Amino acid sequence: MTWPYATPGIPDELFERAEGVPMTKAEVRSVALSKLRLRRGGVLVDVGCGTGSVSVEAALIMGEGSRVYAVDYDEEALMLTKRNAEKFGVADRVVLVRGKAPEVLAELPKADRYFVGGGGLELPAIIKAAVERMEKGIIVADVVTLESLKAAVEALGELGLDYEVTQIFVARGQRKGRYTVMTALNPVYIITAYA
């Protein structure tokens, strides 16, 4: 399958998914990708790739000659990422990396763009490792808890980086008989830092 559009936001249902493997939803993914300011032929590290939705869309946007390092410790997540990359014709640009962040980041080539999908308790260490691996670039992290937001902002402050925080609330309409009911997704904080 090819995605014929130049804009991000591949519908969630077009990605292969599995129970327990997280996916950055289309609306949040679109904003995160725009915050990354991806370039043709660029290099992105997707930490906690899950289903690979960000990896796939980034590879499509950056085009031929680009590299996306899709990092996850979960073998099932990496297999989903592989299948989704194949489905959308970008398997040649997506490199699967099994390992735990932040340690595994030291094994990767330098990149000027990092996307962190979650990170949990390791989020501050992941941010610090990413900054150490780039001369100049952008880090975008999506988090859902206030604790993760606080940890990320504190880590960025300690590093002296400029950053911005955007909170996104998404509700999708669902038909219920004659009516359309708006169903909310979890609010997400998108943290963008400039190194």
Swiss-Prot record:
Q: Where does S-adenosyl-L-methionine bind?
A: T24, G48, C49, G50, T51, G52, D72, A101
Pathway, according to UniProt? Answer: Cofactor biosynthesis; adenosylcobalamin biosynthesis; cob(II)yrinate a,c-diamide from sirohydrochlorin (anaerobic route): step 8/10
**Which segments does the entry list as coiled coil?**
none
**So what does this thing catalyse?**
Co-precorrin-6B + S-adenosyl-L-methionine = Co-precorrin-7 + S-adenosyl-L-homocysteine + CO2
Q: Determine the domain of life of the protein's source.
A: Archaea
> Which keywords describe this protein according to UniProt?
Cobalamin biosynthesis, Methyltransferase, S-adenosyl-L-methionine, Transferase
Put simply, this protein is called Probable cobalt-precorrin-6B C(15)-methyltransferase (decarboxylating)
Annotated organism of origin: Pyrobaculum calidifontis (strain DSM 21063 / JCM 11548 / VA1)
Identify the taxonomic lineage of the organism of origin: Archaea, Thermoproteota, Thermoprotei, Thermoproteales, Thermoproteaceae
